[in-house]
Amino acid sequence: MAQLIDGKKLAEDVVSTVKTETEKLVAATGVVPGIAVVIVGEDPASQVYVASKSRKAKECGFHSVQHDLPETASEQELLNLIEGLNNDPAIHGILVQLPLPGHIDSGRVIQTIAPEKDVDGFHFINVGKLGTGEVETAFVPCTPAGAMIMIERVHGRDLSGLNAVVIGRSNIVGKPMFNLLLAANATVTVAHSRTKDLPAIARNADILVAAVGRPQMVKGDWVKPGATVIDVGINRIPAPERGEGKTRLVGDVDFAEAEKVAGAITPVPGGVGPMTIAMLMANTLTAACRSAGMKKPVF
């Protein structure tokens, strides 16, 4: 039976470090990490995400502000707001909750955020830094950053000699995951929907990262015995056994099958998910430390 990589516990450890390092930063410099969360419209899922981010920021001792714009807000109004936040010395991290309404160009909005305040790690400058191995000065997207900490807890920081396979090539998870694994000296293959004989490629992985958004796609016989399996997927599927109309959350990996083969595995829920918000807090603290000329903490 595989070792369970407990995302809730690891996220608590990260947040605990953030709290301690925040207190040190405030004591040494008077700088309080500040995060601004911007939400446009009233999408219920976005409201839940934003509320949880704001709660966690306050728990960490941050200065946290939320800007709510109506669904009808123009792109220019949003850009003007971001420009103001870019110039606000009390704000170190800016997060625009996606998705945005259809009349707003998300790409343009994200590229307007000052790279040094881009705690989501989506600005081209941060993407480029990560792609050229400048991990120390980049902001890394929160989900792959959290997944990487989970891998490090099993294998350490140096992955020399290990084969890693990332299933999925999104800009948010797949590509940054590839770059992080490569920077840690793993030999990395990126697979996707056009990959030939995906199960055979997956079976070669000492570290298998699934980030495709297809429920339970990765079966037990895709997993190399003893491999570390990181399941980034969050999918809601019908659960008639719980009652009519009920659903449950599953990952991209068939957990029941894979758990019997893997050496270590993340559950869904309670795996990568909690790490995402924890790493957002870590990135915000890092931004504040950089602005104060202090060394960034190690998580």
From Swiss-Prot:
UniProt cross-references to CDD domains, sorted A to Z: NAD_bind_m-THF_DH_Cyclohyd
GO-annotated cellular components: cytosol
Coiled coil: none
Reported function: Catalyzes the oxidation of 5,10-methylenetetrahydrofolate to 5,10-methenyltetrahydrofolate and then the hydrolysis of 5,10-methenyltetrahydrofolate to 10-formyltetrahydrofolate.
This protein's record includes keyword ATP-binding: no
UniProt GO BP: L-histidine biosynthetic process; methionine biosynthetic process; purine nucleotide biosynthetic process; tetrahydrofolate interconversion
Catalytic activity: (6R)-5,10-methylene-5,6,7,8-tetrahydrofolate + NADP(+) = (6R)-5,10-methenyltetrahydrofolate + NADPH; (6R)-5,10-methenyltetrahydrofolate + H2O = (6R)-10-formyltetrahydrofolate + H(+)
Pfam families linked: THF_DHG_CYH, THF_DHG_CYH_C
Entry keyword set: Amino-acid biosynthesis, Histidine biosynthesis, Hydrolase, Methionine biosynthesis, Multifunctional enzyme, NADP, One-carbon metabolism, Oxidoreductase, Purine biosynthesis
InterPro entries assigned: Aminoacid_DH-like_N_sf, NAD(P)-bd_dom_sf, THF_DH/CycHdrlase, THF_DH/CycHdrlase_cat_dom, THF_DH/CycHdrlase_CS, THF_DH/CycHdrlase_NAD-bd_dom
Name by which UniProt lists this protein: Bifunctional protein FolD
Gene Ontology molecular-function annotations: methenyltetrahydrofolate cyclohydrolase activity; methylenetetrahydrofolate dehydrogenase (NADP+) activity
Residues involved in NADP(+) binding: G168, R169, S170, S193, I234
Family, per entry: Belongs to the tetrahydrofolate dehydrogenase/cyclohydrolase family.
UniProt keyword annotation of Cell wall biogenesis/degradation present: no
Enzyme nomenclature, EC number: 1.5.1.5, 3.5.4.9
Quaternary state and interactors: Homodimer.
